[in-house]
Every structure is written in C-alpha cells, then in structure tokens.
C-alpha cells in the first residue's frame, strides 16, 4: 500500500473508491494499491 498526496490510476484495471473519506485505488496488481493520506 502506497500512501500518497495524489493518487492516480496506473493501469486500466485500477479502480478508484472512497472509504471513510479516504480516496483509495484497488487493483488486481498489489503494487498498484494506493491511498490518499
């Protein structure tokens, strides 16, 4: 899980979701997991 100031989709499989006011990227590739923090 990468914690970044700005999250963006890395590949076409990345999905942008919001959980408890946090913007997160989930993907089948675990290297692409990000959240805004």
Curated annotation (Swiss-Prot):
Record keyword Cytoplasm present: no
**Major localization listed first in the record, in broad terms:** plastid
In terms of superkingdom, the source organism counts as: Eukaryota
Q: Which gene encodes it?
A: rpl36
**Annotated family:** Belongs to the bacterial ribosomal protein bL36 family.
Q: Which GO terms describe its biological process?
A: translation
Q: What InterPro entries does UniProt report for this protein, alphabetically?
A: Ribosomal_bL36, Ribosomal_bL36_sp
State the SUPFAM superfamilies in the record: Ribosomal protein L36 (SSF57840)
Localisation per UniProt entry: Plastid, Chloroplast
Entry protein name: Large ribosomal subunit protein bL36c
Cite a single Pfam family from the UniProt record: Ribosomal_L36
Q: Which UniProt keywords apply?
A: Chloroplast, Plastid, Ribonucleoprotein, Ribosomal protein
Q: Which organism is it from?
A: Chara vulgaris (Common stonewort)
GO MF term (any one): structural constituent of ribosome
